[in-house]
Amino acid sequence: LLHTIPYEEAGELGEIFKMSKTESKGNTVNRVQQIKKILVAEDVESNFILLKNLIGREYTLLWAKDGVEAIEMYKQYQPDLILMDIKMPRMDGLEATHIIRSYSKEVPIIALTAYAFETDKELALEMGCNDFVTKPVSKEALEKALEKFSV
């Protein structure tokens, strides 16, 4: 019998969604240190909710609503992976990716976009993204991308 604690909202720069403790038949397994952090840079709340539901409760999700917040949250929380929407207000995902790459070459960044042309994919990869998932995002495509980076 598994129970998962519901997420809590917090954070000034964006919002953090935590799923941190699992109970299994009398044994409590505290997974706070093992849970991977995923920064989701997405300006549309319904898209974030969809991603949250597709990803499930095995991760701590950080929500940035634009590229500027994504950079600040990256610096503050050092996520294990970033899902980066390309078209966002204030600063787009490609520019945010380029700036984040000046801090880290290692963190995997997966571009999320409705633009599915090969030139869009090439530009995202050129700007520092490691992978590319087109919207609408399917559970299979997202799982495949996360598995690629062992997240």
Which residue stretches match the model-derived regions?
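Conserved acidic carboxylate
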Residues: 42
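Short hydrophobic/Thr-rich beta-strand motif most characteristic of the beta2 strand and flanking loop
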Residues: 59-65, 73, 133
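Charged docking surfaces used in two-component/phosphorelay signaling
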Residues: 49-56
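Active-site beta3 strand of CheY-like receiver
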Residues: 77-83
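Receiver (REC) domain active-site loop signature in two-component systems and cognate sites
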Residues: 88
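C-terminal catalytic ATP-binding subdomain
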Residues: 1-28
